[in-house]
Amino acid sequence: MAIIRGIVLYTRQYKDNDLLVRILTETYGMRTFLARGAKKATSKLSAGTQPYTIVTFDGALPKRETGLGYMNDVQDIKVYSRLIEDIEANAYAALIASLIDASFEEGEKITRWYNQLYVALQKLDEGLDPQIIANIFEIQLLVPLGVAPNLRADPITGQVDGKFDYSEKYNGIISEHHFNLDDQRLMLDQKTVFYLRQFSVIDMRQVHDIKMSAITKRGLQRVIDYIYEKQVGLKPRAKSFIEQMHSWQNTLVNFRRNK
């Protein structure tokens, strides 16, 4: 038995009243725990199995890397109310959780990412822009996902200042002096390039109220989506839901304008 602390990423039903709980633990990496009876209304485990809850529990680690652990008794929980009540914040939290889950092996020690996610959930609960929080994860998780685009300097000259654009051909940014080498570059505006580069290295603790225009947000999301489609080949269900949600919002805005 052990006292285990972690962040609940998601749950899956297992038999009638049991749940499989996917948890990013503080110490033991990504693990799946069986919570017997957690779906019962009277279960003491119920509150500790809600997605994006910080939970400390008495349990057992899997005996094998791919096996199940057990959640026996919840000691302490921290719940973020906005992530329950705000559908947009909840959707972006789900996207971040899906990407982290896809990026690392079972049991791989990823304390840095535990800390990043812990702070990110706090930021989301405080009302910071959920798209910006998710964009930071989308960009930084490209490295463990095996893409690792070069966003630091021009690959030909090492230039770090000036105007840049994103090139799939060169797997990252190229300076304006080499725009002619790739006629398929993304033609990004410089504010988008700035945030793309900044978000690749920023620590979540440094993120405060970032103000970004709607145009720049769309541009940044466009390049991120391009990289995930063309180079990663990953699109979580939460991503599709977010796109549908934005489509509904745009339809509603246009309807109100035309009334």
UniProtKB/Swiss-Prot annotation:
Keywords (A to Z) from UniProt: DNA damage, DNA recombination, DNA repair
InterPro entries the UniProt entry points to: ARFGAP/RecO (IPR037278), DNA_rep/recomb_RecO_N (IPR022572), NA-bd_OB-fold (IPR012340), RecO (IPR003717), RecO_C (IPR042242)
Family: Belongs to the RecO family.
Protein name, as recorded: DNA repair protein RecO
Gene that encodes it: recO
Pfam families in the cross-refs: RecO_C, RecO_N
One Gene Ontology cellular component annotation held by this UniProt entry: bacterial nucleoid
Role description: Involved in DNA repair and RecF pathway recombination.
SUPFAM superfamilies: ArfGap/RecO-like zinc finger, Nucleic acid-binding proteins
HAMAP family attached to this UniProt entry: RecO
GO biological process: DNA recombination; double-strand break repair
Alphabetized NCBIfam families for the sequence: reco
